[in-house]
Each structure stands twice: as C-alpha cells, then as structure tokens.
C-alpha cells in the first residue's frame, strides 16, 4: 500500500498546484513550509519516518528567492538528528551559486552530470536528491541515475538507491560458534539475516 500527500502552493486552472509525495511507509509526521517565489508561491513538504526525514520541494526560478528558500529550509531542518534528505526541482544548474551554497550543508547524492530537463531531450540538470551533511550517517549510495522517461513529466525522474546500515544484533541470528576444528585452524560459523 502506498500513502500519498499533497502540499498545494497555488490555485491553478480550477484546482491546486504544488508538491506531491508518495511513500511506502506511513510517516510519523507531515509538515509543510511555504517558500518564497516571485513568479508563483512555492512550498516544501517534510515527511518524518522512524529512521529518516524526507523533504520534497520545487524552488523558485529566481536565484534570490532560492537563496532565501535555502535559509528557510536550513532553519526548518537544523534540529534534525535523523538522516535528512532533500529532493526536488531546484531550478538551478550544478555550477550555480545556489547549488554551491546548498553544498555547504548538503551532500548531493544524485548524479549532477546527468541532465533532467526538459524530459523529451534533457539539456540541463536542475533536479537533485541531497542529504544534510550533519546527519549523513548510517547509509551508503549504491547507485544514482536519471530514468529514461520522457513522457510522465516535463522533467526526467531521478533515482538514488541507498543501503542502510544494520546494527549487529539485527544482522546475526545467533552467536558465532566454532565448527570442525582441524589441524592448526578452526572455522567460525554464524547465521545472518543478510545474503
């Protein structure tokens, strides 16, 4: 079962326009944060889970608004002690001042060398997945890629696969034991919950 959430930013064409989030896990907490945008209002949705926090946003087209948004996001997330991920359309190229400022506190996990926009023939990288450096522990990036899907949106989807660390007591099913001691050596055996 999937859980869907929507944080509207503006009224649009008889409905609402904003940020959506679809999760497998049920969040412990959901919160939205309005962000500046002179061309249109912007927003961020924060979903807190047992082991991490995930934020999704769509930043302004103007650098000044993005910089103000980044300050709000940093203040909004500064008290987090869990790994925190920030994803979305940042409307900024990798060499922009905004991305350089973002990288002071966040580590980009997605591949900024792969273009994401426009979807039919991407020429720009403006979509990212990043993690707050102060809490970037307990996981490793397995892969990061842009998915070849030109029709679902005006941006290509990005995917970052992570492997989370498991505590030893969750990996080992039993205490290690000695088996078949022979000659000058022994074999230590144990059962685990991982392949």
Predicted regions and their residues:
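Structured beta-strand-rich core segments of catalytic domains in phosphoester-bond hydrolases
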Residues: 1-50, 138, 143-148
């Amino acid at each position: 079962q999937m859980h869907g959430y929507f944080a509207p930013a503006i009224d649009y064409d008889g409905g609402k326009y904003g940020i959506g989030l679809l999760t497998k896990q049920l969040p412990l907490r959901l919160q939205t944060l309005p962000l500046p945008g002179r061309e249109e209002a912007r927003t961020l949705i924060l979903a807190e889970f047992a082991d991490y926090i995930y934020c999704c946003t769509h930043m302004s087209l103007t650098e000044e608004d993005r910089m103000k948004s980044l300050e709000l996001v940093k203040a909004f997330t500064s008290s987090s002690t869990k790994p925190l991920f920030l994803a979305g359309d940042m409307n900024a190229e990798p060499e922009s001042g905004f991305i350089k400022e973002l990288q002071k506190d966040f580590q980009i996990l997605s591949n900024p060398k792969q273009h994401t926009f426009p979807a039919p023939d991407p020429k720009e990288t403006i979509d990212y997945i990043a993690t707050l450096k102060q809490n970037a522990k307990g996981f490793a990036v397995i892969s990061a890629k842009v998915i070849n899907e030109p029709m679902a949106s005006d941006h290509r989807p990005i995917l970052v696969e992570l492997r989370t660390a498991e505590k030893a007591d969750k990996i080992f099913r039993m205490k290690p034991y000695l088996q078949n001691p022979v000659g000058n050596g022994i074999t230590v055996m144990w059962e685990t919950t991982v392949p």
